[in-house]
Every structure is written in C-alpha cells, then in structure tokens.
C-alpha cells in the first residue's frame, strides 16, 4: 500500500515516531487521535456444521454508512498507526455495547505495527475499558503490498497469539498471501479469497484448488473459512469440500453498526 507517495518500506520510520509519542492508548480511546471520524459495519461468520454464527468481521464505514474507500482514502503515512489503533477501539466498543458472545474479527495492517508490545496496549486497554474478553478477538492480517520483512510479521503474530488473541490471514490465495506464510507464520486460520470462491460450483479448477488448500490446512491444523459466498450453490459446493465456515452476502451483507442475525433458512 502506498500512502501519499510514502511506500511500505518507509512506513516503519513514521510508525516508530507515532508509537514513541505514546498517542495510542489515551488518544485513541478518547477519540482524539485522528482528524477524521468513522464507524463500522459488521458481517457474520457462520458455521454450517453447527448452524450458527460464530463471529463477526468489523469493516470500516463513514459516519453515514459511506463505503470503506471513502474512509481509507484519508489514511496517510502520518496517521496510519493511529487509524489502525482507532479501528481496533471502535470495533471493540461497538461489540461490547452490543454484548456479543461471538468472536470479533478486526483487520490490521502489518505495516502499521512497529513494536507489537507497544501497539497492542491500545487493544488491551480498550478490551478492559469496555469489558470485552480478549480471547474473543481475532486479528486478520490485511496487506496490499508485498511484505519484505516476513520475520517482523511473524514476530507480531507470535506475540499476539502469546497473549491470547487468534490470528487469521485474510484474502488467502490472492495478492501477496502465499503458501510460504502457512509454514512461516502458522496462523490459526485463513480466509480463502473470494476470487477462488465466486462460481466455484461451476469451475472444476477452482474446486480442485480449494479442495487441495483445505486438505493442506487440515493437515497443518489451520482453520479455513471461505469468504465472498453469494449463492446457495457456492455454499453447498464448499460444504461438500468440508469447508463449513463461510462468510458472504448469501448469509448477510455487512450492516451498519449492527451485528446481523442469519435466517435459519440460510443454513438449510
């Protein structure tokens, strides 16, 4: 990802400066850290085998439900750290207010983390402030530019898992999330990118690829979720491949500041 001409390789300089200023906990918790505001929509994560919603993913939105890009377009190298921290606080606050018992999935950008033990303080403080259990939180690794320092990402993931969080790799099978991440990073779960899911019921190639990926992850004890499920045929094909954890518009679109219920018929 490029922020107003600042490449990912230059971001650590800015991130280190922002972490050093100690703006994270107090500023983000009180909503003072950013010069723009935003909120969240939530989309359910479902388990067909249990016929239940087991979690929700938080997705950024404008205050009047404007799409994510209208918010992300305001993120720069100078405020990416504070934006990442504010996303965590916002998602936790809304989840706690709704008193959800399911998992909460929060996207995070590895480039916005310099020292994991410093950056996580905001998350821990928010969980304490709002009374939301940290063991219900999953961090989804989101990256739009190739990560040169995989060891740094591994350090972040190891630390997050050590203190009780789950870690997932988002958009797996597309972009820069490659098979070597399964070996190096040992995530708790992956989310298969919608590009491999869309039309899987009519594509033998996609079916074979996703089947092989699911079997590999099963052998590595890594959970698999398919994202971008839009039709019953896609849902059923994935279920036949033993991919029972799914997400997509077939079950529910993301809803503005709401944790959607999935109709029973969507499981049948």
What is the meaning of each model-derived region?
Residues 63-66, 88, 171, 248:
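Short acidic-capped amphipathic helix/loop micro-motif used as an active-site/signal-coupling element
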Residues 36-71:
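A short, well-structured catalytic beta-strand-centered motif of the EAL phosphodiesterase domain
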Residues 64, 106, 171, 193, ...:
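Signature for phosphate-centric chemistry
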Residues 83-152:
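Catalytic core of bacterial c-di-GMP phosphodiesterases, primarily the EAL and HD-GYP domains
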Residues 73-76, 169-179, 235:
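Catalytic-site-adjacent helices and loops of nucleotide signaling machinery
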Residues 128, 154-166, 211-218, 239:
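Surface-exposed amphipathic alpha-helices with a cationic face
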Residues 37-39, 55, 103-105, 136-140, ...:
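Structural preference for beta-strand elements that scaffold enzyme active sites
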Residues 1-34, 48-52, 143-147, 176-268:
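EAL-family c-di-GMP phosphodiesterase catalytic domain
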């Amino acid at each position: 990802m490029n922020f107003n001409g600042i490449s990912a390789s230059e971001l650590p300089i800015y991130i280190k400066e922002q972490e050093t200023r100690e703006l994270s906990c107090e500023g983000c918790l009180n909503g003072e850290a950013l010069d723009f505001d935003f909120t969240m929509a939530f989309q359910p994560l479902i388990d067909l085998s249990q016929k239940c919603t087991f979690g929700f993913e938080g997705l950024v939105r404008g205050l009047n439900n404007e799409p994510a890009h209208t918010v992300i377009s305001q993120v720069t190298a100078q405020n990416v750290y504070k934006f990442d921290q504010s996303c965590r606080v916002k998602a936790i606050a809304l989840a706690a207010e709704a008193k959800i018992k399911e998992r909460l999935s929060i996207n995070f950008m590895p480039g916005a983390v310099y020292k994991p033990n410093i950056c996580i303080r905001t998350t821990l403080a928010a969980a304490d402030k709002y009374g939301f259990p940290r063991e219900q939180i999953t961090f989804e690794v989101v990256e739009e530019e190739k990560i040169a320092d995989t060891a740094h990402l591994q350090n972040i993931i190891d630390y997050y898992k050590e203190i009780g969080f789950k870690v997932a790799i988002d958009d797996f099978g597309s972009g820069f999330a490659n098979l070597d991440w399964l070996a190096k990073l040992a995530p708790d779960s992956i989310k298969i990118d919608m590009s491999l899911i869309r039309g899987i019921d009519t594509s033998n190639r996609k079916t074979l690829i996703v089947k092989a990926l699911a079997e590999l992850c099963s052998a590595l004890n890594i959970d698999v979720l398919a994202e971008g499920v839009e039709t019953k045929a896609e849902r059923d094909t994935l279920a036949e491949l033993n991919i029972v954890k799914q997400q997509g518009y077939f079950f529910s679109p993301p809803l503005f500041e709401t944790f959607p219920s999935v109709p029973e018929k969507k499981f049948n």
